Amino acid sequence: MNEIMDMDEKKPVFGNHSEDIQTKLDKKLGPEYISKRVGFGTSRIAYIEGWRVINLANQIFGYNGWSTEVKSVVIDFLDERQGKFSIGCTAIVRVTLTSGTYREDIGYGTVENERRKPAAFERAKKSAVTDALKRSLRGFGNALGNCLYDKDFLAKIDKVKFDPPDFDENNLFRPTDEISESSRTNTLHENQEQQQYPNKRRQLTKVTNTNPDSTKNLVKIENTVSRGTPMMAAPAEANSKNSSNKDTDLKSLDASKQDQDDLLDDSLMFSDDFQDDDLINMGNTNSNVLTTEKDPVVAKQSPTASSNPEAEQITFVTAKAATSVQNERYIGEESIFDPKYQAQSIRHTVDQTTSKHIPASVLKDKTMTTARDSVYEKFAPKGKQLSMKNNDKELGPHMLEGAGNQVPRETTPIKTNATAFPPAAAPRFAPPSKVVHPNGNGAVPAVPQQRSTRREVGRPKINPLHARKPT
């Protein structure tokens, strides 16, 4: 037998399939595999894409029948102009079959006017390696791209018509695909090893009553519902004299232990951990504990409870995971946790399950207006001033309105002495006018402007008396 096994190991990988591989390599590519790009001038260059040639190599040689090796990558030039990078890169790739046959060739990749330097290097090196891979694979035969250098073949292949491949939804690799039996057994074996060493931080054991004469089985009730309905986190295990029943209960507990660890909420297990003193008080007091004699549901679950019950495992789970916990164990209708429960005493006017704008009809029913006229009334339009009003009444001629938090003050009227000067002695320049901001808080008394008879621009020209001509 050993001699036969040694002969099988020394046997070529391809064996009788080498002729089939050679037959496939001699065939030329169909129009489905050929792509074209614009070359120099108006010419069009035929080529095969990198992902297509990799798929062909896997189909011909097998997924484990060939391998690639990047021998070298060299940067030929790197130019920077106005913050843009241009890179030229050369790569050498070797393709080796399992039989030892290999092909090696060179590839080139360029990137022009790339703003980001890392992206320029990435594109240049990848394109160079892909080009070298395609040139190396074409050395094995026509089916891997060597036929694209035959001009007569390219002239005839353009006339061949073909239908594009249809999209097959059943040929997609989905997460629901079956896994091999070997991987399943390995996974189950690892899970069993993990279950033997549970997480100590996530386990919380309640101390039971130490009285040996007591025959009551204590069950911890966790109140996690807003309406006050208790929910049982984990039922107590019955300690039976029958070894077969005990083994069955232990197996079921180990099977669900991993699921409970996944459903735990880490945010509930840090500051809310129970101390040893609290655990002892919980076991001695009857405030948060129910007995199996009073609860028929618990009595139904543990009919063979003995005088020395085992320590019960108490865990905290999120409200989202409460449904899965309830499905695994029997829980009475009164203790079922309902995550969609809404108290009847609270009136829900807005649908909490959706996110949308509040309709205008709801605001109208609540006498809420969406108009903003009252806000805009506090600001004056552009180029205008707010009217001097206080409580919708005009102020007197001797009252001026101040800021919003100031009391109107009384001012004395300003007397103008326009009649004190004769028309000839009137000022030659226009009186200065004080600019008032439209939204200013302070009020400025309105000074009547005296209209001048003549307005001069620049320096006035006044002749002296002796230079005047006699009239």
Curated annotation (Swiss-Prot):
Recorded superkingdom: Eukaryota
Localization annotation: Nucleus
GO cellular component: mitochondrion; nuclear chromosome; nucleus
Region annotated Disordered, chain positions: 166-251, 417-471
Compositionally biased region (Low complexity): 420-432
A GO biological process held by the record: double-strand break repair via homologous recombination
Stored InterPro entries: DNA_recomb/repair_Rad52, Rad52_fam, Rad52_Rad59_Rad22, Rad52_Rad59_Rad22_sf
Biased composition (Polar residues): 182-198, 205-227
Keyword Oxidoreductase found: no
Pfam families (UniProt xref): Rad52_Rad22
GO molecular function, one term: DNA/DNA annealing activity
Keywords tagged on the record: DNA damage, DNA recombination, DNA repair, Nucleus, Phosphoprotein
Quaternary structure, from the entry: Part of a complex that includes RAD51, RAD52 and RAD59. Interacts with SAW1.
Note: Present with 1080 molecules/cell in log phase SD medium.
Family label: Belongs to the RAD52 family.
Function: Involved in DNA double-strand break (DSB) repair and recombination. Promotes the annealing of complementary single-stranded DNA and by stimulation of the RAD51 recombinase.
Protein name (record): DNA repair and recombination protein RAD52
Organism classification: Eukaryota, Fungi, Dikarya, Ascomycota, Saccharomycotina
